[in-house]
Amino acid sequence: MAVDVPKSVIKKLVFFTVAMVVLPLLTFFTLQHLTSNTIISGGLAALMANVVLVGYIIAAFTEDTTEYAPEGKESKKE
């Protein structure tokens, strides 16, 4: 019983997954290079992870779901 997942959903998920890994690490090591304070580097890396998470939540809520409606159910916009 396979489910057809739209490519835009997969692309969005892959983008935010990569961003969740890369941005905090990039932030941590960049700030670690600029300053020797590990607390600041770690704190801002955690902040970047939260920024990515909030961005994903906003993108998920603003996604247009009418085009993904099952064939048997019509949207109420008619």
UniProtKB/Swiss-Prot annotation:
An example Gene Ontology biological process: vacuolar proton-transporting V-type ATPase complex assembly
Residue ranges of the TM segments: 13-33, 39-59
Protein location: Endoplasmic reticulum membrane; Endoplasmic reticulum-Golgi intermediate compartment membrane; Cytoplasmic vesicle, COPII-coated vesicle membrane
Lumenal domain ranges by topology: 34-38
Protein keywords: Cytoplasmic vesicle, Endoplasmic reticulum, Membrane, Transmembrane, Transmembrane helix
Similarity remark: Belongs to the VMA21 family.
Listed name of the protein: Vacuolar ATPase assembly integral membrane protein VMA21
Disulphide-bonded residues: none
Keyword Protease among UniProt keywords: no
Its job: Required for the assembly of the V0 complex of the vacuolar ATPase (V-ATPase) in the endoplasmic reticulum.
Pfam families, alphabetized: VMA21
Topological domains, Cytoplasmic: 1-12, 60-78
InterPro entries the record matches: Vma21
Predominant location: endoplasmic reticulum
UniProt membrane topology term: Multi-pass membrane protein
Organism, as annotated: Candida glabrata (strain ATCC 2001 / BCRC 20586 / JCM 3761 / NBRC 0622 / NRRL Y-65 / CBS 138)
Annotated Gene Ontology cellular component terms: endoplasmic reticulum membrane; endoplasmic reticulum-Golgi intermediate compartment membrane; ER to Golgi transport vesicle membrane
